[in-house]
Amino acid sequence: MDKKERQEIERQRRETALKNTFFNRFLLLRYSIALFFFGNIYWVLIQFIRPSLVMIFPIILVVFSILATVEQFRLYGKRSVRLGITQMFVCLQAIISTGLLVLTWTSWFTYLFPIFENNQLARVFVFIVLLLGLVISLLDIRRIQDIYQQKDKAFQRYIQLEKSSLNL
């Protein structure tokens, strides 16, 4: 390998490092979307025990989580940040979680979560899980705002890496 080939390999390596660092800005969003996807899939499956119109909510959330995942992967290698579907999904997840938190303490509990017994312990467990999901959703909304405003730590690392690679 001559000097020119080594320089080209080094340039490609730096370019890939920059691309990956920029894409890592969305890492926590991708993890939380995956968590919500599997949680909502589980909710769809338990709705088959006693099918009702309630099944529409987890199905909508699953569809939006798939669309948000596709949106995330389309961002790889692009400098533009468009998180419209992801933001819509996270907001929808937060709204539905808030509604479910309230409905957990009503007679709707057994329709929403037919695998749980209608007792205080089950309601508290479901309430805590829903509350954790709501907190994650709210943190995701904040993270998206930070990304749009370029206030996220990952963007600062990207800028530092970009500056250091320009100096080489």
Question: Where in this protein do the model-derived segments appear?
Answer:
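N-terminal signal-anchor transmembrane alpha-helix
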Residues: 1-54
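Membrane-interface segments at the starts/ends of alpha-helical transmembrane spans
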Residues: 82-86, 112-126
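Short, highly charged, low-complexity non-transmembrane loops/tails of multi-pass membrane proteins
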Residues: 147-168
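Generic alpha-helical transmembrane segments
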Residues: 52-73, 92-99, 129-132
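C-terminal halves and exits of single transmembrane alpha-helices
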Residues: 90-117, 134
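Alpha-helical membrane-embedded segments
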Residues: 123-143
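Membrane-helix interface/capping segments
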Residues: 70-85
